[in-house]
């Protein structure tokens, strides 16, 4: 079997990777690292790693031990920061190069994806059970609530003053609860997606226009698109709902006027590996970035789970629905958040050419 050239292997590595010389200066960086660090190879090459990245680990000591012992070294639970980006927890692996032991290979494994994949397999059945129970309760509770609202309306006919205000309050609150229960039922009854080749920019345009004349009228929505993106395979209506939900979250989180940036780009190296060992390339990237207050730290790790919300009157179903739809599209969604910047990234497959 003929092996591909080293350059192709290097460029195809799914993990961020860098090569450092004897002075710990960057001599090579692969495309996955450029994307993850949001820094170009031109900007990094020749630079001391510690000058461009903030890493909560003694890098000089780590690299010195690797060169001295001629063996790989693993460092877990490291916080890595570049520029204004929020810290990302990573695992690092440093190893010497066989033909040049003074050169060190550094692999970066972001913890977020690995942790979420592990959690997903454990909580999936529990979440499904919770949703099933919620659907059943919603159906059973709606009927008596309708009776309560009807009785309150009948009572109000012979009342006035403070007593009338109380019956009106009963009617308003029962309607609010019924609306919430209908959202729970809707979440559990999302139809399977009708998969067809979809231009993701058409989807984003529909969502942007709807937001601009409604809940997002006070926001500045900036488009930063790669016009060369190929179609994805998906359900245009459901994907529109995904981006409407993300735009709505960003708009509601903003204090007064804010800015939302819609960005698309192609990452040929991104591949999602599932717990069963399989995998799929997800090269189409869509980012929704806002300058709002960020996601509260105590719910950041569970923001895509049902009934988790950072807003006082939120149902906690919007992002759970987004995650569910993207999962059914064989895609992936992730989030980075800090005060002043929240980034949701959706990764999707390319539509087969024969369709």
From Swiss-Prot:
Pfam family for this entry, one: HisKA
Record PTM Phosphohistidine, positions in chain: 139
UniProt keyword annotations, A-Z: ATP-binding, Cytoplasm, Hydrolase, Kinase, Nitrogen fixation, Nucleotide-binding, Phosphoprotein, Transferase, Two-component regulatory system
Domain Histidine kinase per the UniProt entry, residue ranges: 136-352
Catalytic activity field: ATP + protein L-histidine = ADP + protein N-phospho-L-histidine
GO MF annotations in UniProt: ATP binding; hydrolase activity; phosphorelay sensor kinase activity
Any GO CC annotation of this UniProt entry: cytoplasm
Primary location class: cytoplasm
Description of post-translational modifications: Autophosphorylated.
E.C. designation(s): 2.7.13.3, 3.1.3.-
Domain PAS: 4-71
PROSITE patterns in alphabetical order: HIS_KIN (PS50109)
Subcellular localization(s) per the UniProt record: Cytoplasm
Record-given protein name: Sensory histidine kinase/phosphatase NtrB
Gene of this entry: ntrB
């Amino acid at each position: 079997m003929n092996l591909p050239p080293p350059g192709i292997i290097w460029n195809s590595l799914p993990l961020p990777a860098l090569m450092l010389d004897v002075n710990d200066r960057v001599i090579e960086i692969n495309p996955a690292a450029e994307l993850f660090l949001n820094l170009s190879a031109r900007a990094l090459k020749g630079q001391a790693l510690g000058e461009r990245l903030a890493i909560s680990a003694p890098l000089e000591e780590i690299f010195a031990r690797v060169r001295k012992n001629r063996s790989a070294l693993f460092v877990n639970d490291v916080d890595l920061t570049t520029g204004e980006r929020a810290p990302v927890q990573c695992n690092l692996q440093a190893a010497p190069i066989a033909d040049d032991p003074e050169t060190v290979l550094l692999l970066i494994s972001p913890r977020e994806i690995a942790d979420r994949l592990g959690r997903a397999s454990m909580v999936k059945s529990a979440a499904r059970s919770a949703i099933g129970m919620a659907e059943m309760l919603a159906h059973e509770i709606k009927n008596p609530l309708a009776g309560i609202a009807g009785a309150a309306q009948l009572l109000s006919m012979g009342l006035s003053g403070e007593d009338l205000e109380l019956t009106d309050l009963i009617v308003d609150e029962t309607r609010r609860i019924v609306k919430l229960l209908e959202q729970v039922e809707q979440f559990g009854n999302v139809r399977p997606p009708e998969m067809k080749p979809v231009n993701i920019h058409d989807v984003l345009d529909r969502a942007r226009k709807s937001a601009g004349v409604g809940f997002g009228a006070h926001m500045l929505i900036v488009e930063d698109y790669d016009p060369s993106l190929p179609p994805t395979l998906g359900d245009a209506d459901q994907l529109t709902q995904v981006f409407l939900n993300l735009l709505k979250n960003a708009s509601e989180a903003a204090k007064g006027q804010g800015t939302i940036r819609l960005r698309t780009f192609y990452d040929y190296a991104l591949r999602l590996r599932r717990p069963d060992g399989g995998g799929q390339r997800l090269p189409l990237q869509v980012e929704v970035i806002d300058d709002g207050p960020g996601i509260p730290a105590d719910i950041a790790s569970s923001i895509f789970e049902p009934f988790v919300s950072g807003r006082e009157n939120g149902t906690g179903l919007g992002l759970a629905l987004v995650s569910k739809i993207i999962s059914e599209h064989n895609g992936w969604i992730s989030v980075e958040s800090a005060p002043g910047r929240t980034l949701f990234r959706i990764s999707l497959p390319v539509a087969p050419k024969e369709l």
